Amino acid sequence: PEGYTLDTTKYEVSVTYEGQDVTEVTRDLTVKEQVKKQAFQLIKVSEDGEQTETDLVAGAGFKVYLISDLTQVKNGKLKPSNGESYTASDFKNYDFSKEQVAVTYENGTAVPVPELITDTKGYAVSPELPYGSYVVVESTTPENLKTIDPFVVNVENDSREPMQWRVFDDRPFEFLLKIVKKDAQTG
């Protein structure tokens, strides 16, 4: 089935004659196909568009959600804007505050994916996620930086190597400040 690795083992099944009145013979066989899974990795940088070198961003946090488990996807309120599959822009204004994070499985037990926090090199890697489409949201934004838009990760292959790097740029906040100096006597 889709989303599973192919078990190439050849299994021997014995079917014996059970009489002329038996129209159907059933044999049970367990096949050990595994769900495809793969991690993804990212790196966070910060630049203002003026510099040639970028700063690595430590302490940025990301939460991972399985798209098919999101409330508005399940109840049909949110549909893919392109009519086929969800894109990052579909989740730009989505409220994730009441949603459950995605799960991965350890020995058959569902384990919530923890918040991914970038290290001092701006690097974070997810656990191996089961086959499916996920939306990743920046949940912790370091001080004085802008939060990046959500992005979509599609797990389609079975690999122990994380998906290639995704580089995200947290630009510093820019603002204008106007100072008006007033004289105490003239106002």
Q: Model regions: which residues?
A:
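Solvent-exposed loop/turn and edge beta-strand elements of beta-rich ligand-binding domains
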Residues: P1-G187
